[in-house]
From Swiss-Prot:
It is an enzyme of class 1 (oxidoreductase). 2-oxoglutarate binds at R168. Fe cation binds at H96, D98, H158. Binds 1 Fe(2+) ion per subunit. This is PKHD-type hydroxylase KPK_3192. It comes from Klebsiella pneumoniae (strain 342).
Amino acid sequence: MMYHIPDVLSADQVAEFTRQLAQAEWVDGRVTVGNQGAAVKQNQQIDTRTPLYARLQAAVLDALRGHPQFFSAALPRTISAPLFNRYGPGETYGFHVDGAVRQNAEAGWMRTDLSATLFLCDPESYEGGELVIEDTYGQHRVKLPAGHLVLYPASSLHCVTPVTHGVRQASFLWIQSMVRDDKQRATLYDLDRTIQSLKARFGDGEEVLSLLNMYHNLLRQWTEV
């Protein structure tokens, strides 16, 4: 399943990110991928050895950890250190699949259940640069407002189409979920959204508490911690 998570960053936060990204040191994006990815990757990434990178990735992690919809959809056990990329005119990233495991400074090796892209530019500010994700239903072209995030299975083939005008900037990261199975995780997400909607309309009635009990029993059955 693919999810659009709105307003991970506020407009003020996006403006601050834009200001700081203008001061960043950028390096060839191929330094973070293997041979398969390097053959189709043409972009730039922020140098992860700089103090600016440390501040930006910490800000993204704080925003994600405080976003209820992201937590409900991802059920994160481990979140990788966010990276930041930039695509200028002519730059692109051809179809590829993300590696199944990654090294993480805090957790050692982590399994990549989910991939996420947090858009940092308004879609009107650049042309091209769509994130294209393939699944069993076909191709999905994603180009979200600044501060919004797309979350999708890391097993999906995906690409970034060539930017033809302007600059596309984003943060990207991976999540190891407490619930490994995509269908089980989607069931829990749908159930949680239903519970939250019913609570907003009717309060904590008997039926809502029954669904909440069901949610936690399923989570207890399916989770890996």
